[in-house]
């Protein structure tokens, strides 16, 4: 098990106050699940610590642990500490999130990550700044702004296709667009995923996902709404 040692404050709900400090923003996030084991959100170490202190963690798992160091007990001379695991299930989350959509929110850079930064028409790989969210069936012709009608396209290919379908433009799609699963969405939106978190999420990714190709951890990025 890999252990991270961090000093942090502002927990409030803890029985023993922790000394002043700051979590490194480059530290990986904690994967928060509901009580049924479904992923719900990425949280920082401070939020995870608050769940532990309130007794709201139903169960946890993972090969990584984060140790938060607190104040020193005057009587014993021992320093308080709180150990967080990299994956935590939060009590009450299942009921609170009933009816939550299983389809990830459509974000431009998550689309590019789904498509592995590859243009659907020429097959080139590009930076996010050089890609566009391209509607297979143009919106002006009734095409929807949904995952299954969007592909990543470089700017020249997008301009060449214009307001036509791929068939009309003579530009065959190199891959088929699809709607990511709930688990896949969590991978696409985080660029700093620990190996145990990745293994947990990949277990819920359907076989047709392109994340089953090489290096799924390389797809994370910063996100902008489409």
PLM feature segments, named:
Residues 103-131, 151-157:
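Short cysteine-rich loop/turn motifs with clustered Cys
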Residues 23, 112, 145-147:
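Short coil/turn motifs at beta-sheet boundaries
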Residues 36, 144, 157-159:
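A generic structural motif
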Residues 95-107, 133-141:
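Short Cys/His-rich Zn2+-coordinating modules
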Residues 20, 108-110, 143:
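Short, flexible, glycine/charge-rich loop motifs used to bind or transfer phosphoryl groups or to couple energy/partner
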């Amino acid at each position: 098990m890999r252990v991270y040692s961090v000093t942090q404050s502002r927990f409030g709900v803890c029985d023993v106050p922790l000394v002043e400090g700051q979590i490194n923003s480059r530290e990986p996030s904690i994967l928060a699940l509901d009580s049924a084991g479904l992923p719900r959100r990425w949280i920082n170490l401070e939020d995870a610590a608050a769940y532990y202190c309130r007794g709201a963690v139903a169960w946890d798992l993972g090969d990584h642990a984060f140790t938060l160091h607190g104040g020193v007990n005057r009587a014993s001379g021992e320093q308080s500490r709180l150990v967080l695991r990299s994956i935590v299930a939060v009590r009450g989350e299942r009921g609170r999130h009933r009816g939550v959509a299983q389809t990830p929110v459509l974000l431009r850079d998550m689309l590019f990550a789904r498509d592995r930064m590859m243009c659907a028409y020429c097959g080139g790989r590009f930076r996010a700044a050089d890609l566009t969210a391209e509607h297979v069936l143009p919106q002006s012709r009734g095409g929807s702004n949904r995952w299954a009608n969007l592909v990543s396209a470089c700017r020249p290919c997008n301009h060449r296709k214009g307001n036509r379908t791929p068939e009309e433009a003579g530009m065959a799609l190199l891959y088929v667009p699809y709607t990511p699963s709930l688990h896949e969405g969590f991978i696409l939106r985080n660029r700093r995923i620990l190996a145990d978190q990745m293994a947990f999420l990949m277990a819920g990714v359907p076989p047709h996902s392109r994340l089953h190709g090489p290096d799924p951890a390389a797809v994370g990025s910063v996100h902008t709404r489409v």
